[in-house]
């Protein structure tokens, strides 16, 4: 049975609950099958595992721990967040390159994690999509932050875009910050590369097609209203058997997750509640 919940969240908390009391995460490394050394952080002592995958040009510490997301999850779950290859403290065989989906599977194998919740932001969401295609049986739930899956059909893409066009766009400082971010990402990417969330793991061979209608994995998407949310989620809404679409009013690709600072409590609350609702 399809369950769809569209959530518009309006309250803003300045600090996540328990943010200041969070202990330092554990820091470790493992070596991927191609010899690349991958850094990862862990938190929490009990409960099901949650795997967190950060975005392009970021790190596990900044995106998940500094924001308060990982500490909130670690109250009732075990959390692991990797620095994608080419990022953070992991090896950088391709400077300014993207992450690799197989690194996530190999990290789970290294830690003997049979199944886990998974959540990725931006590029991390692209990697999450690949993981659902490669090994859906390994995941309890899947989360797309600042991301989703675009429609392959041109007519369906246009329909989703028309829905986004009805939403207001960012203005002033928010719009200027997004322009600076796009310019920084464009300058960092190799020539000819597309957006990181659409090319999350070029080193992953033979990724099978993803047919969400054949999966039973509950899926959540969390996007700002200024971040073209319907273009990212229309396919998820059509195909996923269980899908929750969370749209944060007045948030951009940058402010929806507040990288490097306290996280908007709305994102944390939606993510934690969803994971707990389908934990098994």
Question: Which residues fall in each region the model found?
Answer:
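Catalytic active-site module of serine/aspartate enzymes centered on a nucleophile-bearing elbow/loop
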Residues: 249-280
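Conserved HGGG/HGGXW glycine-rich cap/lid loop of the alpha/beta-hydrolase fold
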Residues: 36-89
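Flexible "cap/lid" loop of the alpha/beta hydrolase fold
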Residues: 129-134, 142-170
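Conserved loop-alpha-helix segment in the C-terminal half of the alpha/beta-hydrolase fold
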Residues: 71, 225-251
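Gly/Ala-rich beta-loop-alpha elbow adjacent to hydrolase catalytic centers
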Residues: 120-124, 128
């Amino acid at each position: 049975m399809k369950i769809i919940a569209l959530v518009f969240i309006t309250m803003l908390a300045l600090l996540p609950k328990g943010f200041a009391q969070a202990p330092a995460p554990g820091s470790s490394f493992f070596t991927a099958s191609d010899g690349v050394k991958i850094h990862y952080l862990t938190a929490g002592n009990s409960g099901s595992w949650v795997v967190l995958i950060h975005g392009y040009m970021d790190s596990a510490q900044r995106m998940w721990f500094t924001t308060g997301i990982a500490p909130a999850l670690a109250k009732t779950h075990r959390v692991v967040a990797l620095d994608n290859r080419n990022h953070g403290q992991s090896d950088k065989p391709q400077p300014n390159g993207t992450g690799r989906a197989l690194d996530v599977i190999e990290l789970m194998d290294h830690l003997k994690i049979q199944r886990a919740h998974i959540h990725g932001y931006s590029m991390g969401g692209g990697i999450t999509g690949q993981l659902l295609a490669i090994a859906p049986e390994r995941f309890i739930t899947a989360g797309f932050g600042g991301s989703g899956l675009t429609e392959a059909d041109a007519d369906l893409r246009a329909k989703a875009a028309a829905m986004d066009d009805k939403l207001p766009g960012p203005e002033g400082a928010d719009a200027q910050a997004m322009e600076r971010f796009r310019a920084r990402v464009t300058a960092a990417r190799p020539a000819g590369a597309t957006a990181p969330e659409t090319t999350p793991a070029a080193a992953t061979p033979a990724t099978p097609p993803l047919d969400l209608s054949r999966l039973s994995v509950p899926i959540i998407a969390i996007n700002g209203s200024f971040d073209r949310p319907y273009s990212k989620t229309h396919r998820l809404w059509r195909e996923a058997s269980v899908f929750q679409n969370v749209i944060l009013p007045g948030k951009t690709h940058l402010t929806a997750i507040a990288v490097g600072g306290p996280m908007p409590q709305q994102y944390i609350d939606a993510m934690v509640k969803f994971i707990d609702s389908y934990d098994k």
